[in-house]
Amino acid sequence: MLSPRRTKFRKQQRGRMRGMAYRGSTINFGDYALQATEPCWITSRQIEAARRAMTRYIKRGGKIWIRIFPDKPVTMRPAETRMGSGKGSPEYWVAVVKPGRIMFELDGVSEPIAREAMRLAAQKLPIKTKFITKAEEYI
């Protein structure tokens, strides 16, 4: 699973997910892409599950690019702990995804195969997504 090798600080504030994604919202590597239509935190486990689903479906052909990286730590307190005594310890990592963000790109396969692979990947993610092609993007 994906996680940063080292970070400047162990813990982060939660922040807010307002507005659209302007960076990372165009297809740069492949011919087909999966685009987020809602804001969400996507965990490294969800990214890995989606990647596996796509890889298993396209088998040997094609190349996959993961365009999001989980660089935000999410902290949790132990169960049945009283309030106070500081922030919890980091438990897992998330990628902050805004609407319009390209999450996965795919190349080297036909459009029906790419569409089905992206559909399988989208089922593993907690948000609504959209399948887009490079041809559609520049109309």
Curated annotation (Swiss-Prot):
InterPro entries tied to this protein: Ribosomal_uL16 (IPR047873), Ribosomal_uL16_bact-type (IPR000114), Ribosomal_uL16_CS (IPR020798), Ribosomal_uL16_dom (IPR016180), Ribosomal_uL16_sf (IPR036920)
Any GO CC annotation of this UniProt entry: cytosolic large ribosomal subunit
Keyword Iron: no
One Pfam family of this chain: Ribosomal_L16
PROSITE patterns from the UniProt entry: RIBOSOMAL_L16_1 (PS00586), RIBOSOMAL_L16_2 (PS00701)
GO biological process, one term: translation
Gene Ontology MF terms: rRNA binding; structural constituent of ribosome; tRNA binding
Record bears the keyword tRNA-binding: yes
Keywords: Ribonucleoprotein, Ribosomal protein, RNA-binding, rRNA-binding, tRNA-binding
Reported function: Binds 23S rRNA and is also seen to make contacts with the A and possibly P site tRNAs.
Protein family membership: Belongs to the universal ribosomal protein uL16 family.
Subunit structure, interactors included: Part of the 50S ribosomal subunit.
NCBIfam families, sorted: rplP_bact
Name of the protein: Large ribosomal subunit protein uL16
